[in-house]
């Protein structure tokens, strides 16, 4: 069975996400469990995995992957995402990932850390053509003895 160029390139996108995720998991997510959250709406899957969200971190990061079964992903990530915590709304600092277009995208979304670190927060993503924002909720555990 041969693999078409399109299938090979699609697999490369998933490989990039796996690499990004592995790096994030290995570099200091001890502050809390690193669990990927997924949302599927209108045939587009968005997966978000928190990276370094430590209390002493100045920059927080999230691995974000988009996968579409049919349509191109033309989202401008920096314009469509906001971090909400303690009544504050924080726009992303940077997107280090694939540019808009294609059916698969992955990258790292970076924010200036909210200080003091909230007990919980939401990553909200507004996408064109979707009735309401996608919401990814993160709750920090109390690890004190």
Predicted regions and their residues:
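Bacterial N-terminal signal peptides that target proteins for export
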Residues: 9-19
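Bacterial N-terminal signal peptides
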Residues: 20-26
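Short beta-strand elements
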Residues: 137-145
